[in-house]
Amino acid sequence: FRGYLYTDLLKRYKEVIIYDEDLDNIKKDMPVSSEADGWNFVYNDLKYAGEHLPVDKTPNGRLTSGAAYAMLSRAMLYAERWDDARIAAEKVMGMGYELEAKEDYSNAFKAGSKEAILQYCYDKSSTVTHDFDGYMVPGGDKALDGNSMTGGFGTPTQEMVESYEYA
C-alpha cells in the first residue's frame, strides 16, 4: 500500500513530498507537504483501500480490507488521531479475526490462521523462496547458502526464550 510507505516516511521525516499522480508526470520541483497533509493523505489512501479490497482472506496472502484498516489504525496512532485509529480498529475487529486459543497456539503461524490479518504464505513445492529464516539466526551464522547478510535482526533475547516452557 502506498499509505503504508508514506506512514514510514512520516514517522521518520514528519514532512514529505506527496506524489499522487502517475510517476511519469512527476515534477522535480514538488513542494514538501505539512505533516498534517501527509497524515490526511495516508488516511484517505488506506481508507480507500479498506473500502475497495475484498474482506475474504482467500486465497491466503491476498491483501484484504482488514489489512488496510489495520494499517490505517496503526498509522492514525502515530498521527495521534485517536478517533480515526479507534474507528479503523473497530472495523478490523468486526471482520471475524480472532486470537487463537492458548491450547492451539501453533495455529497462529499456519496459513489461513484466523488470527492473521496480513500474512506471508509460502509453498514448499513452489520455486518461490525467501530469506526470512536468515533474520532469525545469530549474526554471522551461515544458515543460508550464498552471501546472506541478514543474520540476527529477529534473534530472540534469552529472556524471551526462557518465557516458554521447555519441551
Language model feature labels by segment:
Residues 1-63, 79-84, 88, 94-95:
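Aromatic-anchored glycine-rich loop motif in surface-exposed flexible loops
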Residues 39, 43, 47-50, 62-167:
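An aromatic- and glycine-enriched ligand-binding surface/loop that stacks and positions planar moieties
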